[in-house]
Structures are given as C-alpha cells and as structure tokens.
C-alpha cells in the first residue's frame, strides 16, 4: 500500500511541479494550537499541499517567552502552517485539525494540561476570518456541546527553540498525543460509499457511463449536461457516490468537457501514467472505486495553480447544495462557496 501511495504522490507532484514553472502558488498561513506541538506539526507535515511548518508560541501577553515560561506568559503551543490554497483548501486544513483535537476540552489535550495546551486558530490575514468562522459554525452543528476552540487574530508569535522544531523527525517514537496514522487515511468516513460489482454497474449505469468509468472511454466533447453547468453543489463519482469536485473549483475551459482546478479534497482522486493513443498523459480516477474520470493537464488558470482536470461528465453525478445534507453530504457543505 505504501508503495502505491508513493507512486501516486510521485506522479502528482511531478505534474504539479511542472505546472509551477512561474510559481503559480497561492500561499496562505494559518496558526493552529492543538496541544503539544510535536505531534500536531508531524501530522500536518504529512498533508498534501502543506508547504512548510514551524512551531512556536502564540497569543500570549508579550512578544517574548520560551518553553519554560509559558505558564506565566500565557502563550499557546502553536504550529505555523504555510499551505498552497491551490492544492488544499483552508476548510480541509481545518477538518484535519478538528480530527486530531478534542474541541471541547479546555486547557488540556491528551495527557498535557495547562493553558499552553489550549486549542486555538489564529490568523494574520483578515481575509481568512470569515472562512474560519463559517467552518466553526458548520462544525458546531454536529454537536450539542459548545466548541471550546478560540479564534483570534495572531499576536506575539514567538518561534520555538530549535530543539522543538520537527521534534518527531529527530526523535522517532518520541512522545506524541496525535495518531499520526490518521494522516494516511481518508479524511471522512467512507463506509457509506461502495464500489459495486461489474454486474451491478451494468444494470445501474447507462452504456456511456459504464464505458467511460469501466473501460476508459471518452464522451464526445460538448455532449455533457455538466459542460456549461454552473449551479452550486458537489460532483460525486457516479459509481461509488464519493465526492470528487466542488462547484467552487469548476470553470469553463472551452474544451467541451467539465473542467475543475482541483479536487474537493486532496484524497479524493488517484493518478496514473497514461501512454495510450501515442500520448503521455496523467489519468485521473476516483480513489475509492478506481473509476476512470478523465485526465489532468497543466494548461489551467494560472491564478488557480495551473491545473485543468478535464473530466467526463458521464463519470459524475451532481448534488445541489440545497440537497447535500439530506443526501448524506453534510460534511462537504463547507467546500461549496
């Protein structure tokens, strides 16, 4: 499994780096306090689209502190994350964050107790404030208990000592309150998404849907109802019903097929080298059912990262925003703007 993931990651990164000739990145910074920063940093270093991280102390009383003074200075152990929003959305970053914290615990995460171990989301870019607030509001609907994560502008961030930077890289097996294996698993529960048998698919899918998803056929350009489609919602795999793309990332490429700048989450798709028809391309598949979707090219909008996911409409099913909750896609509403 690890070998497969490495090959997929290698194909993706080679493709993406090729699209980055003019540095078409959209870098953003977020500061996350989630208990002991050793484990939190190690977790986010595994997430695709995270460019770099460092650990420090945030939102204390002054611009000076150190590890041994946190009890007095009021700072929280915090991970500074720089991510490329053209690869991974802030919503996905925050979904990962909530995955590894207890959002109701006050001044305690894992075995660590004290105000320095409180949870917090801090920002130095006011344009992120509304997105963070919307995410928290959406997350709160899942619980009766009030979320205890503080959301504030960043202040008095102090870089931690070298000893703490990449601590678990330097000390494998060191103390960690975070289950790092979660970073290699699907972000959301996929138990409700199934890959039917070939016989079931032949009975459920149209001839075109079957030939595209199972036999790697290509629909005629300009033939899909989704080509010029611009309603808000998500596009799911016609086979497994797993979410693949958001309408927020859809654009009209003029090529005759539905086009997107990125998948809805970084774990939604698979990538394969395709040498068919005398060309070298990157095939895009659904990660769960391995349905053929189309290909990804490096001629997309530069301000969105330069990628164009050229997708057969026959491989997709659209779920309108207003129907997402009743159809079982509540977790994904936050990805639709």
Curated annotation (Swiss-Prot):
Example GO molecular function: L-methionine:thioredoxin-disulfide S-oxidoreductase activity
Chain positions covered by the region annotation Peptide methionine sulfoxide reductase A: 28-181
GO cellular component terms, A-Z: cytoplasm
Key words, A-Z: Multifunctional enzyme, Oxidoreductase
Catalytic residues in the record: 36, 310 (nucleophile)
Its EC number(s): 1.8.4.11, 1.8.4.12
GO annotation (BP), single: response to oxidative stress
Reaction equations catalysed: L-methionyl-[protein] + [thioredoxin]-disulfide + H2O = L-methionyl-(S)-S-oxide-[protein] + [thioredoxin]-dithiol; [thioredoxin]-disulfide + L-methionine + H2O = L-methionine (S)-S-oxide + [thioredoxin]-dithiol; L-methionyl-[protein] + [thioredoxin]-disulfide + H2O = L-methionyl-(R)-S-oxide-[protein] + [thioredoxin]-dithiol
MsrB domain location: 198-321
InterPro entries linked to this entry: Met_Sox_Rdtase_MsrA_dom, Met_Sox_Rdtase_MsrA_sf, Met_Sox_Rdtase_MsrB, Met_Sox_Rdtase_MsrB_dom, Mss4-like_sf
Described purpose of this protein according to its UniProt entry: Has an important function as a repair enzyme for proteins that have been inactivated by oxidation. Catalyzes the reversible oxidation-reduction of methionine sulfoxide in proteins to methionine.
Family statement drawn from the similarity comment of this UniProt entry: In the N-terminal section; belongs to the MsrA Met sulfoxide reductase family.
Name of this protein: Peptide methionine sulfoxide reductase MsrA/MsrB
Organism: Campylobacter fetus
Gene name for this UniProt entry: msrAB
């Amino acid at each position: 499994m690890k070998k497969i993931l490495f090959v997929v990651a290698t194909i993706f990164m080679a493709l993406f780096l090729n699209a980055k000739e003019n540095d078409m990145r959209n870098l953003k910074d977020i500061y996350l306090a989630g208990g002991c920063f050793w484990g939190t940093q190690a977790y986010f270093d595994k997430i695709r689209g995270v460019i770099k991280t460092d650990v420090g102390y945030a939102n204390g009383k002054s611009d000076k502190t150190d590890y041994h003074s946190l009890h007095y200075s009021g700072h929280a152990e915090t991970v500074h994350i720089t991510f490329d929003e053209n690869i991974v959305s802030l919503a996905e970053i925050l979904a990962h964050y909530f995955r590894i914290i207890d959002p109701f615990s006050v001044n305690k995460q894992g075995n660590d107790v004290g105000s320095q171990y409180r949870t917090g989301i801090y920002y130095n870019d006011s344009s992120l404030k509304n997105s963070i607030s919307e995410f928290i509001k959406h997350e709160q609907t899942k619980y009766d208990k009030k979320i205890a994560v503080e959301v504030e502008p960043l202040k008095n961030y102090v870089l931690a000592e070298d000893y703490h930077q990449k601590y678990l890289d330097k000390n494998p097996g060191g103390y960690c309150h975070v289950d790092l294996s979660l970073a290699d698993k699907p972000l959301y529960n996929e138990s409700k998404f199934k890959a039917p048998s070939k016989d079931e698919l032949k009975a459920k899918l149209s001839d075109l849907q079957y030939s595209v998803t199972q036999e790697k056929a290509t629909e005629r350009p300009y033939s899909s109802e989704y080509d010029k489609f611009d309603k808000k919602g998500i596009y799911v795999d016609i086979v497994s019903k797993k979410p693949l793309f958001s309408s927020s990332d859809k654009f009209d490429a003029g090529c005759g097929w539905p086009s997107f700048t990125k998948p809805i989450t970084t774990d939604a798709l698979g990538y394969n080298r395709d040498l068919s028809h005398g060309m070298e391309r990157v095939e895009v598949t659904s990660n769960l059912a391995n349905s053929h979707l189309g290909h990804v090219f490096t001629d997309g909008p530069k301000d969105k990262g330069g990628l164009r996911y050229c997708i057969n409409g026959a491989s997709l099913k659209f779920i309108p925003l207003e129907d997402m909750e009743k159809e079982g896609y509540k977790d994904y509403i936050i990805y639709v703007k």
